[in-house]
Curated annotation (Swiss-Prot):
Protein function: Shows a broad spectrum of activity against both Gram-positive and Gram-negative bacteria. Also has antimicrobial activity against S.cerevisiae. Has insecticidal and non-hemolytic activity.
Coiled coil: none
Protein name: U1-poneritoxin-Ni3b
Cellular component terms (Gene Ontology): extracellular region
Intracellular or extracellular location(s): Secreted
UniProt note on tissues of expression: Expressed by the venom gland.
Species of provenance: Neoponera inversa (Ant)
One Gene Ontology term from the biological process aspect of the record: killing of cells of another organism
Length: 30
């Protein structure tokens, strides 16, 4: 479900760092 996806996303964010988070958000908006 989406909760599992969200949990994976949070773990991925912690691993990759805030720079990639900003890039992902920018891509999602477009």
């Amino acid at each position: 479900g989406w909760r599992d996806w969200l949990k994976k996303g949070k773990e991925w964010i912690k691993a990759k760092g805030p720079g990639i988070v900003k890039a992902a958000l920018k891509a999602a908006v477009q």
